[in-house]
């Protein structure tokens, strides 16, 4: 997989579903990174539904992961000790914020009220391709985060590149 790249403005449909942008959907609908055991029944009852992992991120966004990427994250979490209070807390916080969503034949996923409330999304949203994941933001919240941190970009880029 080449990775998810780009940004698109979208709106929820009347049932609170998000249409995954076609350019992102192409990568996983073809089956990239999705193995046979990662397929579940689609919401229309077909046997070829693809699912994604949806997570509430600490910054107020939502993140979508394909199964193969999530499995790598899960391996890292499995290495944490349940007997170390910090590590146990991290695992609890991550798993509490996680759900599995099925992509229907039209490329839509349901977003529950819990997830919409976390992200502050009412109708409009921005989907950002961030290589191994898709990040979903409420547009004004994203604009505020970017504006508030605009001066940090050069320093951060200089530190990590």
From Swiss-Prot:
Annotated keywords: Cytoplasm, DNA-binding, Repeat, Transcription, Transcription regulation
PROSITE patterns: SPOVT_ABRB
InterPro entries named in the record: MraZ (IPR003444), MraZ_C (IPR035644), MraZ_dom (IPR020603), MraZ_N (IPR035642), MraZ_sf (IPR038619), SpoVT-AbrB_dom (IPR007159), SpoVT-AbrB_sf (IPR037914)
GO molecular function, one term: transcription cis-regulatory region binding
Subcellular location field: Cytoplasm, Nucleoid
Any GO CC annotation of this UniProt entry: cytoplasm
Disulfide bonds: none
The SpoVT-AbrB domain, residue ranges: 7-69, 98-141
GO biological process annotation, one example: negative regulation of DNA-templated transcription initiation
Subunit architecture: Forms oligomers.
Family recorded in the similarity comment: Belongs to the MraZ family.
Name this polypeptide is given: Transcriptional regulator MraZ
Organism: Chlorobium limicola (strain DSM 245 / NBRC 103803 / 6330)
Taxonomic lineage of the native organism: Bacteria, Pseudomonadati, Chlorobiota, Chlorobiia, Chlorobiales
